[in-house]
């Protein structure tokens, strides 16, 4: 059943977005709350753009997201750009700096498992430049209980991800509006910031799973 769902997911992505294959190592960036690298099997470079003085994941979000994004990925340079602080909060300036870094370092795929309730002009323009360079950006539509999608997932040139329950129904807390892909979002098993297995729920994790599939598509 999950294999069939993965096939449908990949087919849906191909309908709306062009994924150019690349047999070489690709650059993958995860914008989130930091990562406790000792709990991640793959090597991952961390860079801090938050107000914190470290790249550790005190919010118990970025480690789980990173683990899902990069599971079973081998030919990739992995980067975690910490833009969320220990409370899971960020500023537009933090995100702008991280996007500039992605542009400068020719990142191929960017995962954004969070969002802002309001549109931001500067972030939007920087994302446009990033995408014009060929970068694929995947973002969470938010957990807004049927409300409108968060920014930047609401942008037309970004792959916006909504959530599904285990029986493949739209999750009760999933956002509506502009959503390109739905993926599983409830009771997703990953690694927490203490290195233990934990079940997580939310469109953040549906986004991470979708990014993982897109990385595999690009490398297939």
Ranges and model annotations:
Residues 47-53, 69, 82-84, 141, ...:
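Residues at the C-termini of beta-strands that transition into short coil/loop
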Residues 26, 32, 150-219:
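Extracellular S/T/G-rich loop segment that most often corresponds to the catalytic His/Ser-adjacent loop
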Residues 1-8:
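N-terminal Sec-pathway targeting helices
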Residues 27-31, 77-82, 108-113, 136-140, ...:
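Structural recognition of the beta-strand scaffold that forms the well-ordered cores
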Residues 65-69, 102, 210-217:
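Buried hydrophobic packing segments
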Residues 10-18:
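Hydrophobic alpha-helical membrane-insertion segments, chiefly the h-region
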Residues 84-156, 167-169, 195-207:
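Substrate-binding/access-modulating region of protease and related hydrolase catalytic domains
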Residues 19-79, 97, 167, 194:
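Active-site core segment of subtilase-fold serine proteases
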């Amino acid at each position: 059943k999950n294999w069939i769902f993965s096939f449908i997911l990949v087919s849906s992505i191909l309908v709306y977005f062009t994924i150019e294959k690349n047999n070489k190592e690709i650059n993958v960036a995860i914008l989130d709350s930091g990562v406790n690298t000792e709990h991640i099997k793959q090597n991952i470079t961390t860079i801090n753009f938050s107000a914190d003085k470290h790249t550790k994941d005190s919010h118990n979000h970025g480690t789980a997201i990173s683990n899902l994004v990069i599971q079973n990925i081998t030919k990739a340079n992995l980067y975690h750009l910490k833009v969320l602080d220990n409370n899971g909060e960020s500023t537009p300036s933090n995100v702008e700096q991280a996007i500039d870094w992605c542009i400068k370092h020719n990142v191929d795929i960017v995962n954004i498992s969070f969002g802002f309730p309001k549109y931001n002009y500067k972030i939007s323009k920087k994302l446009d430049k990033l995408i014009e360079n060929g970068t694929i950006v995947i973002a969470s539509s938010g957990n807004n209980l049927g409300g409108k999608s968060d920014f930047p997932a609401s942008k037309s040139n970004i792959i916006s991800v909504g959530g599904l329950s285990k029986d493949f129904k739209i999750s009760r807390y999933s956002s509506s509006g502009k959503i390109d892909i739905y993926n599983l979002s409830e009771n997703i098993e990953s690694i927490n910031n203490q290195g233990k297995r934990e079940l997580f729920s939310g469109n953040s994790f549906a986004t991470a799973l979708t990014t993982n599939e897109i990385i595999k598509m690009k490398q297939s």
